[in-house]
């Protein structure tokens, strides 16, 4: 497998372009539980250009009804990215606020039910990151440049994207916009 560096600029540019709109290449899951992780996955794909088409446990989108749980589900997105096994697709580590960069992801528990419910992408951060100067873009409560401090969360976790693995013989089509 080949390592693919994460193109943070491409991920953030995609986030800015589609924060208040919907890319017609992807279904809008807003009325089916929310579109935040679908949007986060689109941003991540814009920055890596690779998917993992393993049924059930991969990370991919083909159509509205042919996608992995990790493409649209908050906990499955986390599980896929932080899995320690080396496999095709992007990977990340859970980190703290001081380690995040634009293009990384945040997961928030908003409902107080002990489950993470929301996945924004970080688009900007201050020199010393804080809840006031880490700014995010998201769907399901569409936002761009929204400070983390403005969310009424009960728990938060950060996902620092390290890159992706891709098979050298299978370059995938890359269409960030």
Task: Label each residue range with its predicted role.
Residues 27, 31, 56, 60, ...:
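Generic preference for flexible, low-structure residues
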